Amino acid sequence: MYAVVTRSCRWWSYALIAALLVPACTGNADGGSSSPDGPSSAAADAPRARSPLRDRPLPEPVPYRDAPEGITLADPAFEPLPGADAHFGRLGGAVYQIEIPHAWNGGLVMWMHGFGELGPEATVAPPDFRRYLVAHGYAWAASSYSSTSLIPQRGADETAALWDHFAREHGRPDWTYASGLSMGGWSSHIAAERYGDRYDGALALCGAAGTVPGLRVSAEYLVAGAYVAGVTQAELDASDDVGRLVEERILPALDDPGTRERFDRIMVDLTGGPRAFAVEGIHDEEDTNFARATLLAAARLAPPRDAPYRLGPDSPVTSEEFDREAVVLPTGDGYDEFSAGMEVTGDLAMPLITLHTTGDGQVPINQAQILRDRVEAAGRSDRLVQRVVEDPGHCGFSTAEQEAAFQALVDWVEHGDRPEGTNLAVDDLTDLDRTFEDHPRVTSESDGVVTLRGRARLDGEPLDARWMGAVVRHDGLVTPCNVTLPPSDNGRFELGVYADEASAGCGRRGSDVLLWTYAGDQRLFATAPVPWPAAGAASVEVEFSTSDPLGAAPAITEFSGEVYDDAGHRREAGGRVEAYVSTTLCGVASIRGSEIYVIGVAGPDSIPGCTAGGPVRFVVDGDEAGESGTNAPEQSTHLDLTVPAP
């Protein structure tokens, strides 16, 4: 009924670790292909030169696993974009997807997805900027990997094995670029060091700087929480259930405003220092990181402390005192085996551009600084350019920001035009260059967002859920309006909701907010609405019932996707999307900063004239879209929209 639409990486945030590495072996490949009718929607960029690697013999194939590791593999079949061919199949223990434009320019992007949450099934995730690649003549290829564990090294290796398959089947590309998001960004760092015989350059999006930095983030949430809650090393060592210690000692302590402020200030310093959206990002990822730290401690896989803690002048404690009193999480014999091959040394074999956000609470900005230091120590600074955008989210880049970074990499590799970057060798991160943002972000403290925080219960018990979201109801229209998708932990939650001035159709005076969550695979809505608060924040109590999944929500049809003009250019964030059944306005929304629209189409019970089963037409900033849908209440449809070019 209401689809969850967000940056793909946010789905990888809530589980952690564990299958240890197993020996690799060479496997077999099988696959298929498909192609739609019709010409390419945009002319491909003509290749201007060929990589020096192009005329070399193919390197020795990278070994890969014969079978998936404790998981099943999803069907990789997919529909290509107009003007492209789809190739898909299985390569040993993983499945893959390849998309090649009819007017291929000889360029290839090897895409690496993020952490699979230890899910039961491995799937392929295409790049967010897939349309841009195909429109500009680039092919792309992506692997599911043979595991859904935290395996950045295997992601890099199995993607390189897919490159071998591509080169055998389709010929060696003129240019190849490695890229990935979240754990895939970490994999991109590894690939940029390991596969200079295959790739010409790399674009790493929100990737960790290596094993210890990557795992230390979650551990430090627990360390800082224990410190402000007064949990001692002896208490931690005596506990046989770190999760209970978090639930009963640390989280209740953080409900106190003074303790919360001390925790926030320590965490800001541990993750890079004061900067835009630092606190918002820490709050967004708090439950995820406490859960990960609990698993690290239970599995004795916490990274070793490799340096003293360093806190800034704004922290409520000195570095020396915190270093002396901070608890140490256990590291067991399995750590070395688990982390083998994950490290990033900085010895780059190719140009690398990295992209980070200031508020990322999973891969904080200090990961970019650590990477920079390692690259400098390896004598490879001439091969690194880093960019930062101010955003509160993990991998919270717009697609346009990713596209711009990719084009900068191409210009650097193929034409020698080294791009500009963000200077991170500074003590003050509060005034970074904002050149690389394509739109300003709203904050939970702005007029465009309200914050709902409080307690949630499911069938009378405190709610534990991976996601909570919100829709806003106003004059019969219902619009998805959550800023992020935070979890609920033991009934505690904090959720940002857009106001109408930030996203069309969202909250204003007279609106109701309907919160939602999941219980297993069942979508549940709160049994009562929350009135739109008069101020920027409100404390609320909400109830969900498995016997009444719709709760107080009306039945709507939901559509989501991206908006392009007929020249292949993406419409910018902020555009207004309207949905009509005949001449009746039945839905309104904005194109979000991520270039995604999510719109609810009301049914006849909410607005007369919004006929169930009727055709739905879409208008974007006054322009009629070429696509249409059907008003089918309680259904969700992905639908990209195309409007006339200006």
Where are these regions (language model features)?
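C-terminal motif of bacterial Sec signal peptides marking the signal peptidase cleavage site
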Residues: V22-A24
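Catalytic-loop region of hydrolases
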Residues: G27-P120, P126-D128, T288, T331-G332, ...
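Accessory cap/linker subdomain of secreted extracellular hydrolases
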Residues: P47-P82, A208-E343
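Gly/Ser-rich "nucleophile elbow"/oxyanion-hole loop immediately N-terminal to the catalytic nucleophile
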Residues: A103-W104, A161-S182, G196-R198
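Short substrate-entry loop that stabilizes the transition state in hydrolases
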Residues: G106, G114-D128, L133-V134, A141-S143, ...
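Primarily recognizes the serine-hydrolase "nucleophile elbow" in alpha/beta-hydrolase
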Residues: W175-V228
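Short beta-strand/loop motif that positions the catalytic acidic residue
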Residues: T354-H356
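Histidine-bearing beta->alpha loop at or near hydrolase active sites
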Residues: R383-S398
